[in-house]
């Protein structure tokens, strides 16, 4: 029997493509509408202003991408993306010292955002039931406060307006989502909004890696110590395709990185707690100038708490919960949201109550990422907040002491590290930290000596001795 149901997805980024690939299994046609023109290859586009900065697809999200779009991981790796084991493939100076490089517990896919988006888009659009409509903006939702029945759109070139009916509209348009305004036009109230704003600014530059370090080189990161009472300053070096390093430095309010090339190098060397990243890039070849971004506010819109919610509309991705990009959780949280919607479709099909149930399930799906990001940011000087979340506002001192104990132990205890890494990669939930074996390991404390210098392996040091000037 022919499936006559249709869906419209607003936004053709990562979240939009993933949800489209999922919806194509439940409806007869999916129309993806985006205001941008998409590049023919792995190039940047206007609608992803942060695409020049480092993006991480943690294993918790990568597995979902592979489940929805089988073969995507191999295609990314074939195009030069790096699969980096966590923690064995990273050299990380945490707030508690150098992380011991235990055997792989999770992983990340490291590549440019342009390559990642293009690959996922190409894989998604192989499905003939999915159509991409470019250079088109959404003007209004069709329907009323009880049911959304489609969208009214305008072609940006011709100016022509038309209506696109749909059984389900999914908004994945990101931080600039129009849903709040569009729902108000239907007579619905504004959702409760939370934000945690550390004032973080981050700056990024691309480098050509030294030839000997162009492959099989670890992710290198230097993190702030939130206990110091100073702005949080960080530096991350991530190997990506084509023998390049993407290097991002960041600082919270009062510790923002400079925008000039010399200032960037100085910040990477002297502005963070260890000069390793600065030393690594000192003799690498710069490929770009510095790009800065201030779009780092953690912001959450609680559509799930509205007293009424229209049938036929779901909001997910950054449009419902956007995180400080320094933690790399946005894409993986969006992937979990797609699974939450899929679960509700499987249980309810298109019966009444689907959209409300899905919106509530999405709120649950993004909650761990929300707590992980905001509980870190809220402790920095000058952080501005609007939240009633008791996990952030009550007993903060006691919670921080527990977090610090777990964080310290995770650097030198493999059992605790595996649990912490699973949580931080969104491969497991907060509840996993309450496992009796993990709690017992926390009580035992660190089990290996603390590294006193960057834990680069002999082969990694050997590849750098001739050119990178690294203190090891």
UniProtKB/Swiss-Prot annotation:
Any GO BP: antibiotic biosynthetic process
Cofactor(s) needed for function: FAD
Recorded superkingdom: Bacteria
Protein name listed in UniProt: Putative epoxidase LasC
Protein purpose: May catalyze the stereoselective double epoxidation reaction leading to bisepoxyprelasalocid A, a bisepoxide intermediate in the biosynthesis of the polyether antibiotic lasalocid A.
Phenotypic effect of disruption: Deletion of this gene abolishes production both of lasalocid and of the minor cometabolite iso-lasalocid without leading to accumulation of an identifiable intermediate.
Gene Ontology molecular function: any one: FAD binding
Keyword Nuclease listed: no
Keywords: Antibiotic biosynthesis, FAD, Flavoprotein, Monooxygenase, Oxidoreductase, Plasmid
Keyword Oxidoreductase among record annotations: yes
Family matches, as InterPro entries: FAD-bd, FAD/NAD-bd_sf
Documented EC number(s): 1.14.13.-
Cross-referenced Pfam families: FAD_binding_3 (PF01494)
Species the sequence originates in: Streptomyces lasalocidi (Streptomyces lasaliensis)
């Amino acid at each position: 029997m022919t499936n006559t149901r249709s869906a419209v997805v607003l936004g053709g980024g990562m979240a939009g493509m993933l949800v489209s690939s999922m919806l194509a299994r439940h409806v007869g046609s999916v129309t993806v509408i985006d205001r941008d023109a998409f590049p023919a290859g792995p190039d940047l586009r206007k609608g992803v202003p942060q695409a020049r900065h480092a993006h991480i697809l943690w294993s918790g999200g990568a597995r979902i991408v592979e489940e929805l779009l089988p073969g995507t991981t191999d295609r990314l790796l074939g195009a030069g993306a790096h699969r980096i084991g966590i923690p064995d493939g990273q050299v990380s100076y945490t707030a508690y010292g150098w992380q011991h490089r235990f055997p792989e517990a999770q992983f990340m896919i490291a590549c440019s955002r342009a390559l990642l988006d293009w690959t996922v888009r190409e894989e998604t659009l192989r499905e003939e039931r999915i159509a991409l409509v470019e250079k088109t903006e959404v003007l209004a939702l069709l329907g009323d406060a009880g049911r959304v029945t489609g969208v009214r759109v305008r072609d940006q070139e011709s100016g022509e307006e038309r209506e696109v009916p749909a059984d389900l509209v999914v908004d994945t348009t990101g931080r600039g989502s129009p849903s709040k305004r569009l729902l108000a036009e239907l007579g619905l109230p504004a959702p409760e909004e939370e934000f945690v704003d550390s004032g973080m600014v981050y700056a990024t530059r691309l480098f050509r890696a030294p030839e000997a370090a162009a492959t099989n080189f670890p992710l290198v990161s230097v993190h702030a110590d939130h206990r110091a009472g100073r702005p949080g300053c960080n530096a991350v070096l991530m190997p990506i395709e084509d023998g390049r390093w993407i290097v991002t430095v960041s600082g919270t309010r009062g510790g923002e990185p400079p925008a000039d090339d010399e200032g960037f190098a100085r910040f990477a060397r002297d502005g963070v707690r260890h000069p390793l990243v600065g030393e690594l890039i000192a003799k690498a070849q710069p490929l770009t100038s510095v790009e800065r971004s201030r779009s780092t506010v953690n912001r959450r819109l609680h559509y799930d708490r509205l007293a009424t919610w229209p049938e036929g509309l779901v909001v997910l991705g950054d449009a419902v919960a956007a995180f400080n990009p320094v933690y790399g959780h946005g894409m993986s949280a969006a992937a979990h949201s797609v699974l939450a919607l899929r679960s509700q479709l499987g249980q309810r099909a298109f019966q009444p109550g689907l959209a409300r149930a899905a919106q509530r399930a999405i709120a649950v799906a993004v909650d761990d990422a929300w707590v992980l990001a905001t509980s870190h940011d809220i402790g920095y000087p000058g952080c501005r907040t609007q939240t009633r979340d008791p996990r952030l506002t009550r007993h903060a001192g006691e919670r921080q002491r527990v977090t610090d104990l777990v964080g310290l132990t995770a650097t030198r205890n493999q059992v605790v590290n595996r649990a912490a890494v699973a949580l931080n990669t969104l491969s497991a939930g907060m509840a996993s930290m309450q496992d009796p074996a993990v709690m017992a390991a926390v009580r035992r404390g660190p089990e290996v000596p603390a590294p006193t210098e960057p834990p680069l392996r002999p082969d990694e040091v050997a590849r750098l001795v001739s050119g990178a000037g690294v203190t090891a």
